[in-house]
Amino acid sequence: MWYKVLGIVSLCSVYVSTQGSNLQCKIAGGGELIPIRTPEYRAWVPLGEVGLNVSDSKVLIFAARSCFGAHILLQNNAEDFKNAVYEIVIGGMKNTRSGIRQCVGCKFDEWVKDKALNCRFFNYFWISWCGDEVWVGHGYRPPHNRILRYKYENQPVINAASVRSESDTYWAL
């Protein structure tokens, strides 16, 4: 069953620094639920091709049902999967850790041990790229339940996002 709770709201406040400053960060999507399935180890699925534009947004809220390895790629250019990207891995390494890195497949810049994914049920997540930090959290209420935070020097503008997976994954975006 797909839950309409993932309908995207227009704006949210996201805390983006340790000083507690606020930015109004637009959330990707227009309220329509987009279901996607990514078979294991296939090519990236650009979200723009399925109707989700992130170019004027700073937050992505989604749900994933997977045994392990849900990958989200934040990109400067929708056609470039290698340069000026951030790869967020949720439930990687057989669902033992999640992390953020500046290139596909390289060493994590920041990671945590967790069992974020579930083979039978959807779990909700959010990703924020407000300011010069990338945040990742559980649930659908950023900035609550943050699990990852990483500050990048000279962060490129995020204009696109793509998804893929290490195991058969169902997404609700």
Swiss-Prot record:
- Where would one find the signal peptide in this protein? 1-20
Q: Chief localization class? A: secreted
Q: What keywords tag this UniProt record?
A: Glycoprotein, Secreted, Signal
Pfam entry (one):
Methyltransf_FA
Transmembrane segment boundaries:
none
Query: Glycosylated where?
Result: N53
GO CC terms on record? extracellular region
Keyword Signal carried by entry: yes
Where is it located?
Secreted
What's the superkingdom here?
Answer: Eukaryota
Q: In which tissues is it expressed?
A: Component of the acid-insoluble organic matrix of calcified shell layers (at protein level).
Q: What is this protein called?
A: Uncharacterized protein 5
